[in-house]
Curated annotation (Swiss-Prot):
One of its GO terms (molecular function) is biotinidase activity. InterPro entries: Biotinidase-like_euk, Biotinidase/VNN, C-N_Hydrolase, C-N_Hydrolase_sf, Vanin_C. One of its GO terms (biological process) is biotin metabolic process. It is found in: Secreted, Extracellular space. PANTHER family: BIOTINIDASE, BIOTINIDASE-RELATED. It comes from Mus musculus (Mouse). This is Biotinidase. The gene is Btd. Pfam families: CN_hydrolase, Vanin_C. Coiled coil: none annotated.
Length: 520
């Protein structure tokens, strides 16, 4: 998505600023309800040879180029009244290092729980902390909370059974600075994604920090979003309403594009997610956003090599999209039909002359062929979505997925309803249950599951399944890498459903992505 598509974020901020100026009472009220956040998608300067061992000075010179850009963005954000800014994972030092070659890029990291420290005001307290000092000073200059990611080192003793042979731990670390430059806390990434340069902490860091403008925030990084620890545990145990999320995410369509999973997490848990991704389109890395459960301000651009700053007002108390919604008397016919299918009762429609009833078993008059195709490296079972309306079912193991749909017009495209209930084993191992309505890459069944970004097909639909987990992420992507929001989500008769009418652009993906964290 080009930067022009993110203009509503800045426009929303401008309109709100005008509203704030109406009266002092209005201003106090609005400031209590909203805060101003920023995320920066950064096209980082990378080491030309990350496998080569360089000096600390050479490493600092490369990182300075990225930190200079960070400071420019902080000052630009300060002009817009930003109170918290988030920068991406790997944005300062880059990636593809070995354990040895990354060492000159690492800062020493004292524990904020043991040491209260302001690196900008106390620069000589610890050696090898130049990056932390620079970030601390940025927070002071911008007068805002600042979240960034860097590599850190921590010496360990041979008596420590987990101590690596080289006598140090190396961590992929997020740091949080307050607006006065104090190091508030640090989070060490737990779920590493093929990162040989870093160690996994012995214990999961469950990190929250308090702000005067929005209360409590939680912190995690990139691949963590797919796992119970720390992401879900933070929300369950600490009543967190806001997440800061540095990431270096390579887009994987049709189910795990960066903005797609960011938005899904915000919607599933009813929280705000401030997500900053790295910007390297040639590597498939783009997609940042400020996501609330109901609205998103995002950036996705595979063409423009430049970075992008997103600024938006964010509710301090986000409102979620859950529940079964309207009463039966207010429901449209498609939702009444959906409820009848779930209950197994006949569905009746009244015309001018008489009432017509169909048994639930007869609603799916066209039973299309079942086929298999690879999607996201998993062997999905699918059925094609043909015709202007219908009710489809497809099952795998214990999961059955259903689609009740109407189409105002037929496009010259193939869509399919797919199901997968099993262990995902490529680029990570984790158990998923997925119901997915996707546009296929072509007209052949073997193209279903391919990566596509453009679509024309419009649907009004209910998508649901008998999931064995409560942790279900609603993925919703439309043509041109745009995000949409379901009209309704929730449980009905032990089935989880997603409902949508009136798509404004062609459907790329609508999916319910369930995670069974306890199964491995």
């Amino acid at each position: 998505m080009s930067g022009a598509r993110t203009a509503p974020a800045l426009f929303f901020l401008g309109c709100s600023a005008l509203a704030l100026g109406v009266s002092s009472a209005s201003q106090e009220h609005r400031e209590a309800e909203y805060y101003v956040a920023a995320v920066y998608e950064h096209p980082s300067v990378l080491s030309p040879n990350p496998l080569e061992l360089v000096s600390r000075q050479e490493a600092l010179e490369l990182m300075k180029q990225n930190l200079d850009v960070y400071e420019q963005q902080v000052m630009a954000a300060a002009q817009k009244g930003v109170q918290i800014i988030v920068f991406p994972e790997d944005g300062i030092h880059g990636f593809n290092f070995t354990r040895t070659s990354i060492y000159p890029f690492l800062d020493f990291m004292p524990s904020p729980k043991l040491v209260r420290w302001n690196p900008c005001l106390e620069p000589f307290r610890f050696n090898d902390t130049e990056v932390l000092q620079r970030l601390s000073c940025m927070a002071i200059k911008g007068g805002m909370f600042l979240v960034a990611n860097l590599g850190t080192k921590q010496p360990c003793l041979s008596s420590d059974p987990g101590c690596p042979q080289d006598g140090r731990y190396q961590f992929n670390t997020n740091v949080v600075f307050s607006d006065n430059g104090t190091l508030v806390d640090r989070y060490r990434k737990h779920n590493l994604y093929f990162e040989a340069a870093f160690d996994t902490p012995a214990n999961v860091d469950l990190i929250t920090f308090d702000t005067p403008f929005a209360g409590k925030f939680g912190v995690f990084t990139c691949f963590d979003i797919l796992f119970f620890d720390p992401a879900v545990r933070l929300l369950r145990d600490f009543e967190v309403k806001h997440i800061v999320y540095p990431t270096a995410w390579m887009n994987q369509l049709p189910l795990l594009a960066a903005i797609e999973i960011q938005k899904a997490f915000a919607t599933a848990f009813g929280v705000n997610v401030l997500a900053a991704n790295i910007h390297h389109p040639t590597l498939g890395m783009t997609g940042s956003g400020i996501h609330t459960p109901l609205k998103s301000f995002w950036y996705h651009d595979m063409d423009d090599p430049k970075g992008h700053l997103i600024i938006a007002q964010v509710a301090t108390n986000p409102q979620g999209l859950t529940g079964t919604g309207n009463t039966t008397s207010e429901m449209d016919p498609s939702h009444r039909k959906f409820l009848k299918i779930l209950s197994g009762d006949p569905y009746c429609e009244k015309d001018a002359q008489e009432v017509h009833c169909d048994e639930a078993a007869k609603w799916n008059v066209n039973v299309p062929p079942t086929f298999h195709s690879e999607m996201m490296y998993d062997n999905f079972t699918l059925v094609p979505v043909w015709g202007t309306e219908g009710h489809l079912q497809v099952c795998s193991n214990s999961l059955c997925c259903h689609l009740l749909y109407e189409r105002p017009t037929l496009s010259k495209e193939l869509y399919a309803l797919g199901v997968f209930d099993g262990l995902h084993t490529v680029h990570g191992t984790y158990y998923i249950q997925t119901c997915a309505l996707v546009k296929c890459g072509g007209l052949g069944f073997d193209t279903c599951g391919q990566e596509i970004t453009e679509a024309e097909g419009l649907f009004d639909f209910h998508l649901w399944g008998n999931f064995s987990t409560l942790y279900i992420f609603p993925l919703f992507l439309t043509s041109g890498m745009t995000l949409d929001t379901p009209d309704q989500l929730g449980w009905e008769n032990d089935h989880y459903f997603l409902r949508k009418r009136g798509l404004s652009s062609g459907l790329v993906t609508a999916a319910l992505y369930g995670r069974l964290y306890e199964r491995k």
